[in-house]
Curated annotation (Swiss-Prot):
SUPFAM superfamilies according to UniProt: TPR-like (SSF48452), Winged helix' DNA-binding domain (SSF46785)
Natural source organism: Saccharomyces cerevisiae (strain ATCC 204508 / S288c) (Baker's yeast)
A biological-process GO annotation: proteasome assembly
Domain PCI per the UniProt entry, residue ranges: 235-404
Protein name from the UniProt record: 26S proteasome regulatory subunit RPN6
Gene Ontology MF annotations: structural molecule activity
Family annotation (InterPro entries): 26S_Proteasome/COP9_Components, PCI_dom, Rpn6_C_helix, Rpn6_N, TPR-like_helical_dom_sf, WH_DNA-bd_sf
Keywords: Acetylation, Proteasome
PTM statement from Swiss-Prot or TrEMBL: N-acetylated by NAT1.
Remarks, miscellaneous: Present with 16800 molecules/cell in log phase SD medium.
Residues modified as N-acetylserine: 2
Gene3D superfamilies: 1.25.40.570
Superkingdom as given in the UniProt entry: Eukaryota
General function of this protein: Component of the lid subcomplex of the 26S proteasome, a multiprotein complex involved in the ATP-dependent degradation of ubiquitinated proteins. In the complex, RPN6 is required for proteasome assembly.
Length: 434
């Protein structure tokens, strides 16, 4: 008769040999055997070694289903695995169940299955009166609803959790839930509530020690909200802090998050028209040697187009890196403003050598409709981006040099204003005397 330890080794050997179906049967038989033995020893405590073997078997079988891509089997196994966890300590049950659910993240297109598994696990937690487990899984479920874009469901869970955590004065959980609430409101474009939630998260975080990942997420969210306010200088400083935090992490998604934040850092510098800073960041040792992705390449192409004031290069970069640029909500939301800025910059570059130029010639160079170019030039003149006059009858644009305002006029106006005040005061005093 083989011992559980030897069967565990046998299952691992089969996994290494890619005999996944056989390995699955060994793991299941090991769990069923342990379960039956636990039942037979009614009232007797199961030794720590057997519990550790059960825990290992559950986690390794979950990983096996991920490796196999057996989404349906993993969906069925996780709720079923709670039967084996009845003998576990409460803290260990939380750890094992959360680890199994997190493994689902590695399976593509499994968001609905993750939600189903979370809901079933919450039912188990309520049934067994595991309050801490229920809270932990509810946060996970609210996050999954957020990822699924089911914002109403996510907010309903968040509101319930906030009430409970405030009663318990659970600061770490309050930080996580307020941060998630801020993300949800940001997606709903309610920036005022998003900022309020983020402020609440930071207030709770100030009184406790926060894990590096939480600090990184708080800084990232702060940077995003400052970007929405077009305060790109402050946004960059938050993104930089977030990037440093992710850079020092070794979690499974820390590299991807660091690349994402680095992309936002470059976006901030582009929006500030600090292209030299973009080049310095791209040429930095950590960027060249560690962080390379299509998202960063996309921002590099946009920066070059912006530096050259070339709308054609900008549109080329947009087509080449459409997924990386338009698939990200933050970059997409800022691209209209970036397009307008680049269009203005490109038009200024074209008209720079001329005193008088045909609008049709500008339209031909920039590759846009004549009417569209004329409308934009008219707007730029009104905004005093450059000084000129449109001759619509002939289709010409007259460009003038920017007038130098004489400081003497301002001084004279100020002097007249002060004299006016003195005269008014003298008049008031005279009226009192008479």
């Amino acid at each position: 008769m083989s011992l559980p330890g030897s069967k565990l080794e046998e299952a691992r050997r089969l996994v290494n040999e890619k005999q996944y179906n056989e390995a699955e049967q060994v793991y299941l038989s090991l769990l069923d055997k342990d379960s039956s033995q636990s039942s037979a020893a009614a009232g007797a405590s199961v030794d720590d070694k057997r519990r550790n073997e059960q825990e290992t078997s559950i986690l390794e079988l979950g990983q096996l289903y991920v490796t196999m891509g057996a989404k349906d089997k993993l969906r069925e196994f996780i709720p079923h695995s709670t039967e084996y966890m009845m003998q576990f300590a409460k803290s260990k049950t939380v750890k094992v169940l959360k680890t199994l659910i997190e493994k689902f993240e590695q399976v593509p297109d499994s968001l609905d299955d993750q939600i189903f598994v979370c809901e079933k696990s919450i039912e188990f937690a309520k049934r067994e009166k595991r309050v801490f487990l229920k809270h932990s899984l509810s946060i996970k479920l609210a996050t999954l609803h957020y990822q699924k874009k089911q914002y109403k469901d996510s907010l309903a869970l968040i509101n319930d959790l906030l009430r409970e955590f405030k009663k318990l004065d659970d600061k770490p959980s309050l930080v996580d839930v307020h941060l998630l609430e801020s993300k949800v409101y940001h997606k709903l474009r309610n920036l005022a509530k998003s900022k309020a939630s983020l402020t609440a998260a930071r207030t709770a975080a100030n009184s406790i020690y926060c894990p590096t990942q939480t600090v990184a997420e708080l800084d990232l969210m702060s940077g995003i909200l400052h970007c929405e306010d077009k305060d790109y200088k402050t946004a960059f400083s938050y993104f930089f802090e977030s990037f440093e935090s992710y850079h020092n992490l070794t979690t499974h998604n820390s590299y991807e998050k660091a690349c994402q934040v680095l992309k936002y850092m470059l976006l901030s510098k582009i929006m500030l028209n600090l292209i030299d800073d973009v080049k310095n960041i791209l040429n930095a040792k950590y960027t060249k040697e560690t962080y390379q992705s299509r998202g960063i390449d996309a921002m590099k192409a946009v920066a070059e187009a912006y530096n050259n004031r070339s709308l054609l290069d900008f549109n080329t970069a947009l087509k080449q890196y459409e997924k990386e640029l338009m698939g990200d909500e933050l970059t997409r939301s800022h691209f209209n403003a970036l397009y307008d800025t680049l269009l203005e910059s490109n038009l200024c570059k074209i008209i720079e050598p001329f005193e008088c130029v045909e609008i049709s010639h500008i339209s031909k160079i920039i590759g846009l409709d004549t009417q569209q170019v004329e409308g934009k030039l008219s707007q730029m003149i009104l905004d005093k981006i450059f000084y000129g006059v449109l001759d619509q009858g002939n289709g010409w644009l007259y460009v003038y040099e920017t007038p130098n305002q004489d400081a003497t006029y301002d001084s004279a106006l100020e002097l007249v204003g002060q004299l006016n005040k003195v005269v008014d005061q003298l008049f008031e005093k005279a009226s009192v005397l008479y």
